[in-house]
């Protein structure tokens, strides 16, 4: 034998109020999504999606750091390359002047003028060798001071201390240049070679004996230019990968978080209609009780 449950006015009232609250809550959620443009406004909205969002945002922070590292590395290498190209042009000019100085018909005045020009090139080369980026010498490793000392041409850099930038997980790129390898140091430096050429010109000697030494330094500079170019290509490749990964991450975040505004507007309109309908029904269901009349 079945029994029929007794439905009281209290039960009807509570059920109706719960339905109203549910509709109101859904409408509030839709309004929050529309105003923020995001499907997730608190972790409780979608715990699983929230975890994905936090992970993707963490990836984006890492990618942003890699991007800054790559941009900084690119600036370092561009500074190094510019200094090397300028130095190469100067050394090649010095080579031509050395050949000119080998002309036995040159008078003393011309030879002195050539010597002075050679010394000017030496000073310009020394300035290039002490080039800095953001007050950091680019040819001195991790040392803070000038790479070379004028006069003695001693190398002050830290050969074992290289400047590197991390552009991906497990990928670092050297962004400085070993000054001692490029310009030499002390008596073996290009600066000393130019000093000797200038002295020979003033002494009415033949400076072309130094051409082989000049060529040796040119070859060292060319080798470093090639190395820097290869590293610049690495940085550019890393920047492309970082940009692509950032775009992928942003797209995935958008798919998780971004709302379809047109759909939200439709849903909100439908929810408002449902809420008004529920209010109308509640007004009919929640009739005054005898106690209400007695009051």
What is each PLM-predicted segment?
Residues 1-144, 199-295:
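Amphipathic alpha-helical polymerization modules
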């Amino acid at each position: 034998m079945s029994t029929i449950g007794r439905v009281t006015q209290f039960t009807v009232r509570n059920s109706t109020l719960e339905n109203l609250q549910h509709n109101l809550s859904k409408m509030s959620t839709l309004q929050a999504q529309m105003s923020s443009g995001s499907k997730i406004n608190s972790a409780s909205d979608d715990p699983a999606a929230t975890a994905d969002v936090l992970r993707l945002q963490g990836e984006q922070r890492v990618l942003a750091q890699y991007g800054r590292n790559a941009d900084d590395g690119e600036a370092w290498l561009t500074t190094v390359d510019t200094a090397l190209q300028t130095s190469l042009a100067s050394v090649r000019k010095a080579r031509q002047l050395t050949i000119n100085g080998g002309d036995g018909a040159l008078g003393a005045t011309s030879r002195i003028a050539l010597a002075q020009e050679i010394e000017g090139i030496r000073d310009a080369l020394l300035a290039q060798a002490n080039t800095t980026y953001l007050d950091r010498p680019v040819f001195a490793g991790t040392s803070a001071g000038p790479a070379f000392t004028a006069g003695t041409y001693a190398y002050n850099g830290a050969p074992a201390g290289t400047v590197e930038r991390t552009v991906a997980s497990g990928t670092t790129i050297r962004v400085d240049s070993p000054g001692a390898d490029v310009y030499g140091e002390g008596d073996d430096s290009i600066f000393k070679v130019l000093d000797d050429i200038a002295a020979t010109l003033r002494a009415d000697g033949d400076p072309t004996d130094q051409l082989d030494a000049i060529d040796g330094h040119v070859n060292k500079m060319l080798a470093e230019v090639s190395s820097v170019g290869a590293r610049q290509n690495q940085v550019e490749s890393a920047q492309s990968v970082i940009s692509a990964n950032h775009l992928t991450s942003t797209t995935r975040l958008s798919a998780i978080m971004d709302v379809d505004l047109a759909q939200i507007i439709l849903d909100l309109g439908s929810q408002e209609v449902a809420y008004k309908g529920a209010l109308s029904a509640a007004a009919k269901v929640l009739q005054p009780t005898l106690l209400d009349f007695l009051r």
